[in-house]
Design a protein with these regions (language model features):
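Terminal amphipathic alpha-helical/low-complexity segments used for targeting or macromolecular assembly
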Residues: 1-56, 61
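Structural signal for interior beta-strand "rungs" in well-ordered beta-sheet cores
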Residues: 51-130
Length: 130
C-alpha cells in the first residue's frame, strides 16, 4: 500500500487542494469531502483572480470556458484552465491551473491537478484524483 499513498503518487504543490489532501494518507480517503472543501475554499479566493459565476462556482478570470460548457457547483476552475465545447462538469470538481477539459468530457467529484489534460469524450467521475 506504500505506493498508493498520496505523498508517493502526487506532487501536492501542483494543486489548490494541497492543504486539504495533506490531511489524508490515501487518495480515496479525501474524495467524500471534495464538495465541502470547495464550499469552504471558494469564498476565500482572491476576487481579483476569481469571479463567482453561480452558486458555489468560482472561475479564474484568466480561464477560458466555452459558452456551450455546462458548469454545476461546487466547482473551482483555476487560472489559465480551459473548459472546451460541450464539457459537462456536474459538480464537486476542481480543475487545476493550466489544465484542459476537452470537448464533451464529463467531470464529477474530482480533483484535477495543474497542467493536466483530459482529452475530449472522456468520463472522469465517481471520485477521482487526477
Amino acid at each position: 500500500m506504500e505506493n498508493a499513498k498520496i505523498t508517493n503518487l502526487y506532487n501536492l504543490d501542483e494543486t489548490i487542494a494541497k492543504e486539504y489532501l495533506s490531511q489524508f494518507t490515501y487518495p480515496w480517503e479525501a474524495l467524500a469531502g471534495i464538495s465541502d472543501f470547495i464550499k469552504e475554499l471558494g469564498p476565500t479566493l482572491d476576487p481579483e483572480i476569481y469571479e463567482k459565476r453561480g452558486e458555489d462556482i468560482w472561475v479564474a478570470k484568466s480561464a477560458t470556458v466555452f459558452d456551450s460548457a455546462y458548469l454545476h457547483g461546487p466547482l473551482i476552475i483555476c487560472e489559465d484552465a480551459e473548459i472546451r465545447q460541450c464539457a459537462f462538469i456536474r459538480g464537486s470538481a476542481i480543475v487545476g491551473k493550466g489544465s484542459v477539459v476537452g470537448n464533451s468530457t464529463e467531470l464529477k467529484n474530482v480533483i484535477i491537478f495543474n497542467s493536466v489534460q483530459v482529452p475530449h469524450y472522456n468520463y472522469v467521475d465517481r471520485k477521482s484524483v487526477v
